[in-house]
Amino acid sequence: MRILLSNDDGYFAPGIANLAKILSDIADVTVVAPERDRSGASNSLTLDRPLSLHKSHNGFYYVNGTPTDCVHLAVTGMLDELPDMVISGINDGANMGDDTVYSGTVAAATEGFLLGLPSIAVSLVSMSRGNFPTAAKIVLDLVKRFIDNKFHVPILLNVNVPDLPYEELQGIEVTRLGRRHKAEPVIKYQTPRGETVYWVGAAGAAQDASEGTDFHALQNNRVSITPLQIDLTRYDQIGYVKNWLVF
């Protein structure tokens, strides 16, 4: 079993270290991650300069690019054999609902999926940052299940884990994405030198956290697993737009 690990928090992040440690007991693990925190990078590729690949003292590889760059480079230009699975994370923070559009964690897994590989994005909905081992054990459980019962087709899963000890989890729920309210406005700030700068505002609170959503599962201390797709087409609006053009 060969697993490629990546993330958007950077190769030095505790989440990916926890994941590499626990998965190394059952698989040949290669870590290729960004050299710095690239949270919010989404599915961006670096096209304006070449990428470089380096190996750190802990054996992890790092790239001067985005999470998507890391997976693309590893699968298409670095690894001698294709991985059996791509896993991205463990992200420090939730990737639920609208977060998935912005998330570099989800993007790294998405790139694996686009390259024809089963892929999982995993995030710890963290407050204490003390339960990365919980999320790592959930991933280990999923990988063991995959080894025993492989997917018939490549699949893309988004996993969110409550920030709790493993024994306090209330199970696993297969969910759909919820929705957030719009994000908070940017924060305007004056530097000591008189320059006006802006910080991106916080994500909006949950708008749709109804039963069956990832938000609802996490509110009830359950792990959320959401199968994702790439097709963004609103099929129910195709006829509406056609009629709008005729008018």
From Swiss-Prot:
Cofactor: a divalent metal cation
Enzyme Commission number(s): 3.1.3.5
Protein known as: 5'-nucleotidase SurE
Function: Nucleotidase that shows phosphatase activity on nucleoside 5'-monophosphates.
List of residues binding a divalent metal cation: 8-9, 39, 91
PANTHER family referenced in this protein's UniProt entry, alphabetically: 5'-NUCLEOTIDASE SURE, 5'_3'-NUCLEOTIDASE SURE
Gene Ontology CC terms: cytoplasm
Record field: catalytic activity: a ribonucleoside 5'-phosphate + H2O = a ribonucleoside + phosphate
Any one Pfam family match given in the protein's UniProt record, by short name: SurE
Tagged with keyword Hydrolase: yes
GO terms of molecular function: 3'-nucleotidase activity; 5'-nucleotidase activity; exopolyphosphatase activity; metal ion binding; nucleotide binding
Keyword annotations: Cytoplasm, Hydrolase, Metal-binding, Nucleotide-binding
Family: Belongs to the SurE nucleotidase family.
Subcellular location: Cytoplasm
Cofactor note: Binds 1 divalent metal cation per subunit.
